Structure formats: structure tokens, C-alpha cells
Amino acid sequence: MSLYALLLIALGMSMDAFAVALAKGAAVRMPPRKIAATALVFGTVEALTPLAGWVGGFYAKPFISEWDHWAAFVLLGGLGLKMMHEGLSGEAEDARENKRESWWLTVLTAFGTSIDSMIVGVGLAFMEVNIAFAAAIIGMATTVLVAVGLTVGRALGVLFGRRAEFAGGLVLIAIGTWTLLSHLGLIG
């Protein structure tokens, strides 16, 4: 898998966390140190969950290698549709917590936004990809986008939260479609 495709996946997987960070930033004025710590928690969790999904998918690979491109297409496409639906319906995470939010709640929120990354990890097991590198890219993208989201959220509120979720879904659908079409020989 190309670096460009990995960056698109990382961007798509970071959109849930970015949307939550925008909302959280609008609701809770965090000092820069807490913004950095919160972003690192989200990034670490987002990097670990695709690794867990990849391990599960890797061990299932011999059983489904004949239709692996369909599995990646269905997983990424379904996840993308789910994210788009949440973005349109307003069901995205609402992080309007009180100012004394605990670290456990931050970790739980990070896990909640990274469940999708575990599914992506399963899909990545069926592609030619260095999973450690992919997980690191996903984690770094999430860390940066959460820090940006928390900072920008203070000024812009939740204006872009739903749009970010929708855009992340579009990216995942595009990657899933590209994977399917390239395995079928319809694109280079």
C-alpha cells in the first residue's frame, strides 16, 4: 500500500476523534498542557486499535484470501457509510463534558472513537501493508488532529464536527472502492 493511501486512511480514521475534539474544545477550555496530553491519549489508543484488528485479521487470512479485497471493500465501505450517517444525523460523539473531566473518561472516549480503527486493522491484514508503520501514521495523525480540534474548537464550537465525520466516511469509502477496483484489475 502506498504512503498516500496510508495517509488517507489515517486522515479518515482521525475524523471521529477530530469531531469529538472540536466539540470538547468548544465545551471545555483546556490549557495547552492538557490539550497535548489529551491528544497523546487519543493518538496512542488510535494507534493500538488497528494493531489489535490486524492481528485478528492476519490469523483469519488463510481462510479468506480468495475474497480479501471484498472484505476490505465491505469493511471500509460499511464503516465509511456509518461515519457519513453519523455526520448527517448528528449522532456523532457529543463531548460536552464538565470542566473536571477525568482521565478515565478521556481514555474511554478515545476507545469509543477508535473502535473503527480496529475494523480498519482487520481490513489492513488483507493488504500489503507494514502494520506498525500504518498504526504509527494513524496515531500521529490522530494526535495532531485532536490537538488542532481542541484548539480550534474553543473558537469555532462544533460547527465543523458533523462535516468532519462525513468527510472521514467519504475517505474510507474511497479507499475501500480503490482497493476493490485495483484487485479486480479495473484501475492501476
UniProtKB/Swiss-Prot annotation:
Q: Which domain of life is it from?
A: Bacteria
GO molecular-function term, one example from the UniProt record: manganese ion transmembrane transporter activity
Q: Which UniProt keywords apply?
A: Cell inner membrane, Cell membrane, Ion transport, Manganese, Membrane, Transmembrane, Transmembrane helix, Transport
Output the Gene Ontology cellular-component terms: plasma membrane
Topology in the lipid bilayer:
Multi-pass membrane protein
What InterPro entries does UniProt report for this protein, alphabetically? Mntp/YtaF (IPR003810), Put_MntP (IPR022929)
UniProt-annotated location(s) = Cell inner membrane
Q: Which residues form a coiled coil?
A: none
The residue ranges crossing the membrane are 3-23, 35-55, 70-90, 104-126, 140-160, 167-187
Quote the function comment for this protein: Probably functions as a manganese efflux pump.
Q: Which PANTHER family match?
A: MANGANESE EFFLUX PUMP MNTP-RELATED
What name does this protein carry? Putative manganese efflux pump MntP
